[in-house]
């Protein structure tokens, strides 16, 4: 059994104000005996539409910069796994990567994922400020289970989650900044539950709160049961999970095993 802490909070546009809050959340989660603490997308800083691409890039950092280094050290001092997010510098002066990372209990970065599906939909255009990642990392092995990393809009593309589950993911971690709008919360609930059910895995989905975002951070079990729904509450939610539930679910309901991939060769997936 592992205890997961999910952080739901409203970030400032100033990363120097957000970092102390993030470190405090990590310490609080560790004090409450959590094994892993997961944060939402844009935890580093909120980027309003009025902010230019160059302004966003100016605040971005390398993965080994001060922001992630401080989080890594806090994880080490408190012996807790941290899944965080950042806006990562690229070679272009006006573009960043939307990146999630995994830090182990020793403070070492053991996983990194650059968001592959940018939110160019429903009036938004993330590609005006960001670059899409081009690699789907294999699941990250941790003491709580094998983590598959996706982010927010990625939820709408089931091939990504299926590829990770087929490669051994037991927990999908989905840091998000899910924008408000007609039917958007319904989509959020349905998509997270669907990814859990069809892959027989846990889904841990920390969501950003406030600004234009929905909140509703979730933890869902392999049968699609909602174990935690944080609604509009700012702070930390806790949930206990067991990887044996994933193994038993996949044994009783062997969706990955029963797939007929031999039938798909003539289709463009």
Residue ranges with predicted function:
Residues 1-13, 38, 99, 112, ...:
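Active-site-proximal beta-strand elements of phosphoester/diester hydrolases
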Residues 15, 24-105, 179-197:
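Cys-nucleophile CN-hydrolase/nitrilase-fold catalytic domain and related Cys-dependent amidase chemistry
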Residues 17-28, 157-162:
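Short, acidic/polar
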Residues 45, 101, 112-119, 218, ...:
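Short beta->alpha transition motifs characteristic of CBS
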Residues 60-83, 146, 155-237:
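CN hydrolase (nitrilase-like) catalytic-core segments centered on the catalytic cysteine
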Residues 84-86, 99-102, 138, 217-219, ...:
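Short beta-strand scaffold segments in enzyme catalytic cores
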Residues 91-167, 180-190, 252-255:
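Active-site catalytic loop in hydrolytic enzyme cores
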Residues 247-269:
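A short C-terminal boundary segment appended to hydrolase-like catalytic domains
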